[in-house]
């Protein structure tokens, strides 16, 4: 066994010396590959962070920026690497190609998304321009028809007919809005050329909306003119109103004075009634059956009055 092992070692040494190549350890090779993978990931992250959000760049500019950043990262790492690891730099050149390929794929995806967004923006701008033109043309026709309608009908029937028209306008407006939304979805998805149908739907929607707004505004104007309009008064009418107001104020002041006088009289009478000597029965005494006799309301020392005092022994008659 020892002889066979020695023969194999001798053959390997001869092959190395003849070919001029050195033996590479597998452990060192795997470590170098791991380092290369880590550097490739870090370079991709830096390339992603370098591009600011919301800025659209072309495909060529992105490829240039990515290649420059990757080369700088690898140059810095090559200066730091030991001479034993510099043997396998050919693998890093392969990694650079892979990074560039992935970056180009991402840029293609971003460009495709940007193109889709530009197409959608163009469609929306065309629709807005069509709606503006239709609003300008349709508003004049609606105003003419409504003026003739108001001229024929009476003022009393305006409110009821306009309310009925508003309710019908809202009901007709809902299906037109749903049609327009379906047509917009089909245009964005690219399901066919339906520009004529779009124009018709926008015409219906604009006419309904303009009718509802004009009817509302005219109703409000009619109400304001009927209820809120003030009549212009002449100088004579103003003077008459001022005289009426002054007369009313005088009457009020006289009533207040009379009420105050009556209050003072009542207060004085109450004070004077409390000073009388005669015993005035209360309400409770009046209700009792025992208080049948009511004394006269006059003082005892009045002239011409006789008073009888009856005792057990004698009766006394007193005169004043």
Swiss-Prot record:
Biased segments, Acidic residues type: 1-12, 22-35, 68-80, 117-130, 161-174
Basic and acidic residues bias (residue ranges): 105-116, 131-147, 244-264
Chief localization: nucleus
Low complexity bias: start-end ranges: 207-217
Residues with Phosphoserine modification: 67, 129
Record-level Gene Ontology MF annotations: DNA binding
UniProt KW Nucleotide-binding keyword: no
Pfam families reported in the protein's UniProt record: PAPA-1
Top-level taxon of the source organism: Eukaryota
GO cellular component, one term: nucleus
Family annotation (InterPro entries): INO80B/Ies2, INO80B_C
Entry keyword annotation includes DNA damage: yes
Span list, region Disordered: 1-232, 244-306
Compartments, as annotated in UniProt: Nucleus
Biased composition (Basic residues): 42-59, 268-278
Keywords: Chromatin regulator, DNA damage, DNA repair, DNA-binding, Nucleus, Phosphoprotein, Transcription, Transcription regulation
Any one GO BP annotation for this protein: chromatin remodeling
Primary role: Component of the INO80 complex which remodels chromatin by shifting nucleosomes and is involved in DNA repair.
Additional remarks: Present with 1470 molecules/cell in log phase SD medium.
Family per record: Belongs to the IES2 family.
Quaternary data: Component of the chromatin-remodeling INO80 complex, at least composed of ARP4, ARP5, ARP8, RVB1, RVB2, TAF14, NHP10, IES1, IES3, IES4, IES6, ACT1, IES2, IES5 and INO80.
Name of this chain's protein: Ino eighty subunit 2
Gene behind this protein: IES2
